[in-house]
Amino acid sequence: MADQLTEEQIAEFKEAFSLFDKDGDGTITTKELGTVMRSLGQNPTEAELQDMINEVDSDGNGTIDFPEFLSLMARKMKDTDTEEELIEAFKVFDRDGNGFISAAELRHVMTNLGEKLTDEEVDEMIREADVDGDGQINYEEFVKMMMAK
């Protein structure tokens, strides 16, 4: 399944993997998965984290390595984002709940994920998604951007 991914997608997933793999040892543990989930406002139990890892841990060693992560992402891309998942993702970014993602909100979430972005990079991300030019991202623009990925 992972062989249907483009090189660009694989590079993006490698970057995502390294956000999870906090100690850089090439595997994602339940602890590391929990850290990232909590930084996104989720609060999974230890059992839920273990279940998530077990779902993709094909060699049964209790952690996720990059090939396992790739096959998970390839699977996830096939069941493309349901509307519910998109709404949840939008809410993670729209911290004040006003229906818009501002540059500050985008920077905050990206920083929580370990991505230190310059103001220029944040502004560029907003500009790319901001169809109506109001300087922030509304839900429709967010959906368009997510579907274009």
From Swiss-Prot:
Transmembrane segments: none annotated. Gene3D superfamilies: EF-hand. Residues 8-43, 44-79, 81-116, 117-149 form the EF-hand domain. GO terms for molecular function: calcium ion binding. Disulfide bonds: none annotated. Ca(2+) 2 binds at residues 57, 59, 61, 63, 68. The modification N6,N6,N6-trimethyllysine is found at residue 116. The keyword DNA damage does not apply. InterPro entries: CALM/Myosin/TropC-like, EF-hand-dom_pair, EF_Hand_1_Ca_BS, EF_hand_dom. GO terms for cellular component: myosin II complex. Ca(2+) 4 binds at residues 130, 132, 134, 136, 141. The keyword Acetylation applies. Keywords: Acetylation, Calcium, Metal-binding, Methylation, Repeat. Ca(2+) 1 binds at residues 21, 23, 25, 27, 32. Ca(2+) 3 binds at residues 94, 96, 98, 105. It holds the Pfam family EF-hand_7. The modification N-acetylalanine is found at residue 2. Belongs to the calmodulin family. This protein has four functional calcium-binding sites. This is Calmodulin. It comes from Heterocapsa triquetra (Dinoflagellate).
